[in-house]
Amino acid sequence: HLDLLFGRYTAACTWLERLTGVSSVGLSYRPEGIDSLTALTCQMAAHRACATPFHVADMSDVGFPPVNVIEPGLIKFNFGNEPCGMNDWNDIATHRRTYTWITDEHQHPTGITLTATHPMSGANQLGATYTLTRMLMPACVSMSALWGYSQGKFGAAQARPMAEFVLGHLNPRLKYDFTIYASRGGGAYSRQTTFVVQGEESEAESLQATDNDHDVVRFRDVCPTADGRILLQVMPGPHNNSHHHFYYLNAMVIRAH
């Protein structure tokens, strides 16, 4: 209940029902940073706690089933703090650690979650605005990025040797193809960024983010772990010679098959 987002929202929903008798279930209001699925879970938790205050509330019927059986369309991620506002792209920012409402290109729920277990240091809009990749990114996607750095001190941002994201609740019967893009305009030095994808096996690829408008890294036929998880790690590449060893993540497209 001390969590600044869903914890406080759950507490507020509980007080609403206890003080007024009005259940919060179904209310459209949700604080910034809380998606619709998380909001419903908070509302249901508060309502059931009020209904049976001396018992642990059973929440097993709320949300998606334990094992994901959904076969989604293309899943697109836009990384950065400026929302793109396009329904077929999932905006992933620094102010939220876990996203539980991930949709595919048709706006259908996928049941997949994305959690920044080791978050990036910050965000910018300094990527390429015109790109030549098979990802077909609009400018609002290709130019926005999350960034990190691993050496020295850069402003108030914390140095992190790597960032890590966990894709959870994947359909364990499917394989996944990843296409990942990183870009940062300007500068004569290398901002090479390495990406590691780890499911049942681990693979690594690198690209040059400096002034990149065409290169992507691809991982094919990635099998999730038995519990439906794939890890994505982002870090400076071996040829990165930027002063603080900056690394970037702008966009990602996942195809399930």
At which residue positions do the language-model features occur?
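Surface-exposed molecular-recognition determinants
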Residues: 145, 160, 164-166
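Conserved catalytic region of serine esterases and O-acyltransferases that act on ester linkages
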Residues: 1-75
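Short, flexible loop/turn segments at beta-strand junctions in immunoglobulin-like
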Residues: 167-171, 221-223
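Low-complexity, Gly/Ser/Thr/Pro- and Asn/Asp-enriched, turn/coil-prone segments
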Residues: 67-157, 219-257
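Extracellular carbohydrate recognition and processing domains
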Residues: 202-223
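A short beta-strand element within beta-rich, extracytoplasmic domains
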Residues: 163, 170-186
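Short, surface-exposed beta-strand/strand-loop-strand elements in extracellular ectodomains
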Residues: 165, 182-203
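Residue-level detector of buried hydrophobic side-chain packing
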Residues: 11, 79, 176-180, 195, ...
